[in-house]
Amino acid sequence: MIQPQTYLNVADNSGAKKPMCIRILKASNRKYANTGNVIVAVVKEAVPNMPLRKSEIVRAVVVRTCKELKRNNGMIIQFDDNAAVIINQEGNPRGTRVFGPVARESREFNFTKIVSLAPEVL
């Protein structure tokens, strides 16, 4: 579960290293974001000479959470870190590669481009 002020890892090569969640989108009063939800984040650390800079406001999709994810078939999935993929206003990833596994729930939220770039879908 991701809440405001949570630091995440970036799972793509967009240039950001550590974004911090400042808002969960598509919910008026939601406190937590799970896998597949869109958040608004601020870049706290960035790679030099890349398009994304420090203190830039971006949108991101949560692709991995440390909190257990229960599926309808009874399977429970848990990742080692909280990670997100930086997206643009249309929902397409800003990077060209995605690192690490991605939860299958991203496909259900119509982020098929992120799922196709991922090396492993759990």
UniProtKB/Swiss-Prot annotation:
GO terms for cellular component: chloroplast; cytosolic large ribosomal subunit. InterPro entries: Ribosomal_uL14, Ribosomal_uL14_bac-type, Ribosomal_uL14_CS, Ribosomal_uL14_sf. Pfam families: Ribosomal_L14 (PF00238). Gene3D superfamilies: Ribosomal protein L14 (2.40.150.20). One of its GO terms (molecular function) is structural constituent of ribosome. One of its GO terms (biological process) is translation. SUPFAM superfamilies: Ribosomal protein L14. Disulfide bonds: none annotated. Its main location: plastid. CDD domains: Ribosomal_uL14. PROSITE patterns: RIBOSOMAL_L14. It is found in: Plastid, Chloroplast. Keywords: Chloroplast, Plastid, Ribonucleoprotein, Ribosomal protein, RNA-binding, rRNA-binding. Part of the 50S ribosomal subunit. Belongs to the universal ribosomal protein uL14 family. Binds to 23S rRNA. This is Large ribosomal subunit protein uL14c.
